[in-house]
């Protein structure tokens, strides 16, 4: 049956065809069949299928199956969740235990090494409690505040990569330590081993000490066998056995009293009633330190006696102040290369009767000791009196006669001497010497006499003295401590003025000196006045510093001093040939008539030139100074003791401090000793010195808390470091241009030849730079780098460089702007403080931080001697440094960095007069 029905004739009737739906898109769409329904009519179907091999369609099938880039999974991946408070099970370990660490490794080195595995939260390096060295154990905890899982992962990575790694020559042992128990257990074991070793060393040291002690005792016993009988201690006195150490410390001869017996050095039974210093026997070996060594060591202090026994040496004192001064000065000093430690002992029942003088010890001594002490006192007084008489009667006049030759007497002096001798007949005045036995020997003092004839020289001198007295009255406005000190000085000067014989032309009065002064007067020489000071004055001048002793001028006298070549009328009156007058009225009657005759004769005598030199007081120019020496005294315990001189000052001090609350200090002596010892240990002042505030020299930084130690660690700015560090002092730039015509380099000779030939006129500026650059490569400038006063290192010229010469090329890596930004961040992260980046244009930068030449050491200056230029050489841009002016040998090379202005300022340390203060 024909499938095509179009060939049928139209006359035949239409028949219904049988059909079957082969494909219905509504039931399922197939891309190769489309979206139309496919029918089969009258059972006609498609042609039969032909079987074909699909492998034949692929021409490269024989080569094999192509490999895919994605690997096959051997197993399914497990999902990891971050550990939090809702997680089950224990927390993963976030800390590691590191052992077998070198003792030379510090905690900062370990932190820097383990920081590469993760953020380190805590690092505990175990130390030896006895020596402070490292035990080689460390516990490191990673930061788990942000994420516990990240910290645990960092700990695992640290164990994997750091375990077995050699660090400072030793392989590290790194394990996970969840709760730190491994570290604690290892630390206990190491500590037990250290303690065991320490105990062994202590026992060994004690054994050696016992052996040394036994050998020393044997040596002492052997030495004691050779001591003669007269040096052996007496049986009835408080002595020790023959094996004691006191015999070896005594030498047989004393410098003053001859032989030294054991009874003189035995410690008395009532030693606790003495003020003494004890030197323990441990510090003075008997074979090295002797009795004379101790006596020589304490020779500068007024001790009473030195005793000794098996406990050591006892040095007794009569004065608490002398004992305390000796303790402060000689404690922890050396005697025969042995360091001694003094123990201070005071009388328990000692009371203060005076503000400055300690109470006198009243004890009953045995007859032998009392006799020996009295004998020593008498001998000491006789020696002092003999020395004083020799000085005053023999040495003093001889020295004065040798130093002061007799001047030629003037006409006035001759007339006065002749008239006075003819009108008065008085016998010689015997010299009267009155002195106390207890005085210390001292040389006499020489003072100039006051001449009454100079008191009325001119009206100008009177006006000047009135102004001086008026200025003295203005001193009442000074501080209280200065007024107290001035009052004491005034009383001292008045006491000294009482010792001189003052003869005034107005009332002709004679003031007698105090007891203890020796006055020697001669008629043929200038009149000297010898004044022997007392014990109190000697002590006063000894305790006061030389710079603080000032003498106030006698306010009643207009002229204080006269020279030795002037009139000697007063000396004639007080000559040794004069008799002692009966009363003051007799002196006045006898002196009035010769004075009238002298005035009549002098009116006829020729006029002699009178010396107008006046030595009255001090010279004042303008206003008085504001600061006084007492203003610099630190008002602590030493300062108050320095200002308070006598009982009157002490009463003023009590009145000034009466409103202050009282403090419970128990023993005042021990309290004062603690304060002074603390001050001495801190190194503020030495014992015996006054507490004067030191003047700051050079750089000085004031601390708000009072001490730099109490302010902790803080960063000192670079500008402040440049004020006191020697290599950071601000350099002084000499801005004066040094014009020199010297031609020292080969380049200058070449330029001169070109200039003479007219070559320079035809060269363009760029070509001239190129020629100079080629010459620079042929002959480089002599430069070197070294410590700079501007900033760390700098570049210096080793030869003279003329203006406009090429100095050096700035060489480095040429990078882009983006790379430069990343490198700058990396440099900061790595701890490189300085980066050497030089910009050529907007996107090209030269980096000389790690690769370059010494041109990177050129520092910035606001008044530079060089400039930087960018030139083209063979199509490439290069940075070249030119000399902006003549540069001398040894001068540092600088140029202006020209940083853009920013909010974060960088201080400039160039030190130039035109310095802007900041680089940006």
From Swiss-Prot:
Cross-referenced InterPro entries: COMPASS_Set1_N-SET (IPR024657), Nucleotide-bd_a/b_plait_sf (IPR012677), Post-SET_dom (IPR003616), RBD_domain_sf (IPR035979), RRM_dom (IPR000504), Set1-like (IPR044570), Set1_fungi (IPR017111), SET_assoc (IPR024636)
Q: What is this protein called?
A: Histone-lysine N-methyltransferase, H3 lysine-4 specific
Briefly state the protein's biological role. Answer: Catalytic component of the COMPASS (Set1C) complex that specifically mono-, di- and trimethylates histone H3 to form H3K4me1/2/3. Binds RNA which might negatively affect its histone methyltransferase activity. COMPASS recognizes ubiquitinated H2B on one face of the nucleosome which stimulates the methylation of H3 on the opposing face. Methylation promotes maintenance of active chromatin states at euchromatic chromosomal domains and is present throughout the cell cycle. Plays a role in telomere maintenance and DNA repair in an ATM kinase rad3-dependent pathway.
Instruction: Using the record's annotation, list all stretches that form the SET domain.
Output: 781-898
Q: Name one GO cellular component term.
A: chromatin
Q: Which Pfam families match?
A: N-SET, RRM_1, SET, SET_assoc
Q: Where is the composition biased (Basic residues)?
A: 463-476
Question: Where in the sequence does UniProt note compositional bias of the Basic and acidic residues kind?
Answer: 205-216
- Keywords, in A-Z order: Chromatin regulator, Chromosome, Methyltransferase, Nucleus, RNA-binding, S-adenosyl-L-methionine, Transferase
Subunit field text: Component of the Set1C/COMPASS complex composed of ash2, sdc1, set1, shg1, spp1, swd1, swd2 and swd3.
Q: What is the organism field in this record?
A: Schizosaccharomyces pombe (strain 972 / ATCC 24843) (Fission yeast)
Q: Which GO terms describe its biological process?
A: methylation; siRNA-independent facultative heterochromatin formation; transcription initiation-coupled chromatin remodeling; transposable element silencing by heterochromatin formation
Post-SET domain segment(s):
904-920
Could you tell me where the Polar residues compositional bias lies? Answer: 233-242, 453-462
Q: Where found?
A: Nucleus; Chromosome
SUPFAM superfamilies registered for this protein in UniProt: RNA-binding domain, RBD, SET domain
Catalysed reaction, written as an equation: L-lysyl(4)-[histone H3] + 3 S-adenosyl-L-methionine = N(6),N(6),N(6)-trimethyl-L-lysyl(4)-[histone H3] + 3 S-adenosyl-L-homocysteine + 3 H(+); N(6)-methyl-L-lysyl(4)-[histone H3] + S-adenosyl-L-methionine = N(6),N(6)-dimethyl-L-lysyl(4)-[histone H3] + S-adenosyl-L-homocysteine + H(+); N(6),N(6)-dimethyl-L-lysyl(4)-[histone H3] + S-adenosyl-L-methionine = N(6),N(6),N(6)-trimethyl-L-lysyl(4)-[histone H3] + S-adenosyl-L-homocysteine + H(+)
């Amino acid at each position: 049956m024909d499938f095509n029905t179009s060939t049928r004739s139209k006359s035949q009737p239409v028949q219904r065809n049988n059909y079957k739906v082969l494909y219905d898109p509504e039931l399922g769409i197939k891309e190769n069949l489309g979206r139309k329904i496919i029918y089969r009519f009258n059972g006609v179907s498609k042609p039969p299928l032909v079987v074909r091999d699909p492998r034949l369609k692929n021409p490269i099938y024989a080569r094999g199956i192509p490999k895919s880039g994605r690997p096959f999974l051997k197993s399914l991946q497990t999902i990891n969740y971050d550990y939090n408070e809702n997680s089950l099970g224990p927390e993963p370990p976030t800390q590691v235990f590191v052992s077998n660490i070198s003792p030379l490794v510090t905690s900062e080195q370990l932190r820097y090494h383990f920081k590469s595995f993760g953020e380190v939260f805590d690092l505990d390096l175990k130390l030896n409690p006895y020596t402070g060295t490292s035990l080689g154990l460390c516990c490191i905890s990673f930061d788990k505040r942000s994420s516990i899982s990240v910290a645990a992962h960092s700990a695992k990575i640290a164990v994997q990569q750091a375990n077995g790694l050699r660090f400072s020559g030793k392989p590290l042992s790194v394990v996970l330590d969840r709760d730190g128990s491994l570290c604690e257990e290892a630390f206990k074991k190491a500590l037990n081993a250290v303690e065991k070793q320490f105990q062994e060393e202590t026992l060994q040291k004690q054994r050696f000490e016992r052996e040394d002690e036994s050998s020393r005792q044997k040596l002492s016993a052997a030495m004691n066998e050779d001591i003669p009988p007269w040096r052996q201690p007496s049986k009835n006195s408080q002595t020790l056995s023959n094996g004691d150490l006191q015999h070896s410390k005594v030498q047989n001869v004393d410098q003053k009293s001859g032989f030294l017996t054991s009874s003189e050095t035995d410690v008395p039974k009532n030693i606790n009633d003495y003020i003494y210093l004890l030197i323990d026997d441990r510090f003075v070996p008997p074979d090295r330190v002797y009795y004379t060594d101790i006596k020589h060591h304490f020779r500068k202090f007024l001790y009473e006696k030195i005793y000794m026994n098996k406990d050591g040496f006892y040095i007794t004192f009569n004065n608490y102040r002398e004992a305390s001064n000796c303790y402060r000065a000689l404690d922890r000093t050396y005697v025969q290369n042995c360091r001694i430690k003094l123990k201070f002992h005071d009388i328990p029942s000692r009371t203060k009767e005076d503000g400055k003088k300690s109470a006198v010890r009243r004890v009953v001594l045995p007859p032998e000791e009392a006799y020996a002490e009295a004998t020593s006192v008498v001998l000491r007084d006789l020696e002092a009196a003999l020395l004083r008489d020799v000085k005053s009667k023999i040495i003093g006049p001889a020295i004065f006669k040798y130093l002061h030759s007799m001047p030629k007497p003037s006409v006035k002096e001759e007339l006065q001497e002749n008239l006075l001798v003819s009108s008065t007949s008085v016998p010689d005045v015997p010299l009267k010497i009155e002195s106390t036995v207890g005085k210390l020997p001292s040389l006499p003092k020489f003072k100039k006499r006051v001449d009454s004839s100079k008191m009325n020289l001119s009206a100008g001198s009177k006006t000047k003295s009135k102004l001086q007295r008026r200025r003295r009255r203005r001193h009442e406005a000074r501080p209280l401590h200065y007024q107290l000190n001035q009052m004491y000085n005034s009383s001292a000067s008045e006491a000294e003025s009482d010792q001189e014989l003052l003869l005034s032309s107005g009332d002709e009065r004679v003031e007698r000196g105090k007891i203890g002064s020796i006055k020697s007067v001669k008629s043929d020489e200038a009149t000297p006045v010898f004044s022997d000071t007392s014990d109190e004055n000697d002590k006063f001048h000894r305790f006061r510093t030389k710079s603080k002793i000032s003498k106030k001028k006698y306010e009643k006298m207009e002229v204080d001093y006269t020279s030795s070549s002037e009139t000697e009328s007063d000396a004639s009156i007080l000559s040794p040939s004069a008799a002692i007058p009966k009363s003051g009225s007799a002196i006045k009657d006898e002196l009035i008539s010769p004075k009238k005759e002298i005035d009549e004769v002098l009116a006829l005598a020729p006029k002699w030139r009178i010396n107008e030199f006046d030595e009255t007081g001090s010279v004042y120019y303008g206003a008085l100074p504001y600061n006084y020496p007492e203003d610099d005294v630190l008002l602590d315990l030493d300062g108050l003791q320095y200002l308070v001189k006598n009982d009157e000052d002490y009463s003023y001090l009590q009145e000034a401090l009466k409103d202050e609350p009282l403090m419970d200090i128990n023993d005042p002596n021990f309290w004062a000793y603690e304060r002074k010892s603390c001050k001495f240990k801190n190194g503020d002042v030495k014992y015996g010195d006054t507490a004067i505030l030191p003047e700051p020299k050079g750089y000085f930084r004031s601390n708000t808390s009072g001490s730099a130690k109490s302010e902790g660690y803080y960063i000192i700015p670079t500008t402040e470091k440049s004020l006191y560090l020697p290599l950071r002092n601000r350099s002084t730039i000499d801005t004066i241009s040094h014009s020199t015509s010297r031609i020292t380099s080969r380049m200058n000779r070449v330029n001169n030849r070109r200039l003479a030939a007219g070559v320079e006129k035809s060269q363009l500026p760029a070509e001239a730079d190129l020629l100079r650059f080629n010459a620079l490569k042929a002959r480089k400038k002599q430069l070197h780098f070294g410590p700079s006063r501007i900033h760390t290192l700098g570049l210096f010229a080793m030869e003279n460089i003329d203006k406009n010469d090429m100095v050096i090329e700035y060489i480095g890596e040429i990078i882009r702007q983006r790379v430069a930004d990343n490198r700058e961040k990396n440099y900061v992260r790595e701890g490189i403080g300085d980066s050497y980046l030089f910009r050529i244009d907007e996107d090209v930068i030269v980096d000389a931080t790690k690769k370059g030449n010494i041109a990177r050491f050129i520092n910035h200056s606001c008044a530079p001697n060089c400039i930087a230029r960018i030139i083209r050489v063979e199509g490439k841009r290069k940075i070249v440094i030119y000399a902006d002016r003549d540069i001398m040998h040894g001068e540092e090379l600088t140029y202006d960095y020209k940083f853009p202005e920013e909010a974060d300022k960088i201080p400039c340390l160039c030190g130039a007069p035109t310095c802007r203060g900041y680089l940006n």
